[in-house]
């Protein structure tokens, strides 16, 4: 499959110019490694089954040996050996050069064994990455510039129209922004990527993320409850009540533990409230808007199809908002922005700020 340009490409280039190392974080299958490989000069894949044990033995003995190679050197799934973090930081200090390493991984590392001694501040820049936006998947024309909307008061967007029909938007939301889905011919097969993603998260990754055994059935229930309440301000207690209908003994600490694991896997990424008054506590009193990192996760968790959503446009409205949030996170990142929502006590609201 031909590499499709990502907005993250330019962001990675700039960070490599400014820092000794860059850590790309984000959900699995969103294209982190492929994007990193476009700019790396050498690669080491820590999860290579033929070399993994040898790499781990080297990491335990002398981790700096794994860092030898042409730079920028990509260390894929570095969290397999957390000690590499300090090794990278130390090597960056010693070399005193920019653009030495790229680290990629699909989980937030929980350093229970104290293998990471330093934060990496000033040496290792963290760069979030998301599934593909509609512009990156070549489904949006990109005719409206987000940058110009901010920079040019005279910028006129009247008359700009999308050539995507409602049916195409629904399918794009169900398929998601997973690069692997674009390398598949049939639409039916494209939809399997997101479905398999949810299965892998629930059956394997939610326990593997920190070595704590968790129930796949409960993980599915929590993801389904999140999906039912996607892009709403529903309280955790309401979702827990929804879950206990089918699994009575689920407690709030257990619910929080599962959600935390899904957040560390970059599956759940709630949207925080925005408050225009910097010193005001209004934003703190506002709850988080429930959201997945990609709309296809919600669709797959609910077991819905494009046809189901065509017959239920109200539900699709929430799924569509999730897709808009994903795309705006991708676009606004390049401008140094972030995505929030606004909802005040007078019920004045803006879905996305």
Label the predicted regions.
Residues 1-16:
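N-terminal pre-Walker A segment at the start of P-loop NTPase domains
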Residues 43-72:
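Short glycine-rich substrate-engagement loop in P-loop NTPases that contacts/grips substrate
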Residues 182-353:
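Accessory nucleic acid-recognition modules appended to NTPase machines
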Residues 114-228, 232:
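Interdomain motor-coupling "hinge/lid" segment immediately C-terminal to the ATP-binding subdomain
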Residues 32-33:
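Conserved lysine of the Walker
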Residues 74-75, 100-106, 128, 137:
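Structural recognition of the conserved hydrophobic beta-strand(s) that form the central parallel beta-sheet
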Residues 85-109, 118:
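Conserved catalytic/switch belt of AAA+ P-loop NTPases
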Residues 24:
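Hydrophobic anchor at the beta1->P-loop junction of P-loop NTPases
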């Amino acid at each position: 499959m031909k590499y499709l340009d990502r907005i993250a490409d330019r962001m990675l280039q700039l960070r490599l110019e400014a820092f000794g190392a860059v850590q790309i974080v984000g959900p699995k299958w969103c294209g982190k490694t492929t994007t990193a490989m476009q700019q790396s000069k050498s690669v080491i894949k820590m999860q290579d089954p033929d070399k993994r044990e040898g790499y781990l033995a080297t990491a335990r003995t002398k981790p700096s040996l794994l860092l030898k190679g042409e730079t920028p050197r990509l260390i894929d799934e570095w969290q397999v050996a957390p000690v590499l973090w300090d090794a990278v930081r130390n090597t960056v200090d010693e070399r005193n050069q920019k653009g030495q390493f790229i680290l990629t991984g699909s989980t937030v590392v929980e350093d229970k064994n104290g293998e990471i001694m330093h934060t990496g501040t000033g040496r290792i820049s963290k760069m979030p990455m998301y599934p593909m936006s509609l512009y990156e998947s070549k489904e949006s024309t990109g005719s409206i510039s987000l940058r110009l909307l901010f920079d040019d008061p005279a910028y006129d967007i009247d008359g700009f129209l999308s050539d995507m029909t409602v049916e195409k938007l629904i399918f794009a939301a169900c398929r998601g922004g997973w690069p692997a889905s674009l390398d598949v011919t049939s639409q039916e097969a494209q939809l399997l990527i997101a479905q398999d993603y949810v299965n892998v998260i629930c059956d394997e990754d939610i326990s593997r993320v920190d070595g704590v055994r968790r129930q796949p059935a409960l993980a599915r229930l929590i993801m389904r409850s999140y999906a039912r309440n996607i892009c709403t301000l529903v309280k955790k207690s309401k979702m827990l009540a929804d879950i206990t209908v089918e699994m009575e003994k689920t407690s709030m600490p257990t619910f929080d533990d599962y959600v935390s694991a899904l957040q560390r896997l970059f599956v759940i990424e709630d949207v925080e409230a925005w408050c225009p008054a910097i010193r005001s506590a209004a934003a703190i009193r506002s709850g988080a808007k429930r959201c997945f990192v990609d709309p296809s996760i919600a669709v797959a968790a609910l077991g819905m199809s494009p046809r189901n959503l065509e017959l239920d446009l109200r539900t699709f409205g929430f799924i569509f908002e999730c897709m808009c949030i994903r795309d705006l996170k991708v676009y606004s990142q390049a401008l140094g922005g972030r995505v929030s929502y606004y909802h005040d006590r007078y019920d004045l609201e803006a879905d996305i700020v």
